[in-house]
Amino acid sequence: MLEVKFYDTADDSLLKFAVIISKSDNKWVFCKHKERNTLEVPGGHREHGESILDTAKRELYEETGAIVYTIEPVCIYSVIGKTRANDTGEESYGMLYFAKITEFESQLHSEIEKVFKLDELPTEWTYPLIQPQLIKEAERRGFL
């Protein structure tokens, strides 16, 4: 079982992931990875020497093609338990962001096959025990 926790602050060195809840034209923005049949919120791993905000901006561009947007931090989150991105099960930390995308590049240049703009949240999630909780927390904090 996974446990998701939320924090207002944490040491920057702990932040290994950025996840970006995104909307465009009042629709949810989700990605479909080429190797999966599920949908996910844009996000990914922080690269060495990269700020966590730069991670979020890079991942948002790579996974959605977003080129004009606003982005703001929501909170820090952690996940305890084994996941596709963490096989040790130890607590891992990330920064949750919210972005409003106003313009997309015409082609994707990543492992993402397709970007979806949805009126409703999906039913088939890549990370069903994590990402719905991140969205609920962003909602609770007044971002959605």
Place the predicted regions along the sequence by residue.
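Acidic, metal-coordinating catalytic segment for phosphate/diphosphate chemistry
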Residues: M1-V19
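Short connector loops at helix/strand junctions that flank enzyme active sites
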Residues: L15-F17, K23, K34-R36, V41, ...
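A structural signal for short, well-ordered beta-strand segments
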Residues: I20, P73, Y97-A99
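Conserved Nudix-box catalytic region and its N-terminal flanking loop in Nudix hydrolases
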Residues: K23-E62
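Short helix-loop capping/hinge motifs at secondary-structure junctions, enriched
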Residues: W28-V29, E103-L108
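A short coil-to-beta-strand element that immediately follows conserved catalytic motifs
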Residues: I67-I76
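Active-site-adjacent beta-strand/loop module that shapes the phosphate/pyrophosphate-binding cleft
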Residues: Y77-E105
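NUDIX/MutT-family hydrolases
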Residues: L96, S106-R141
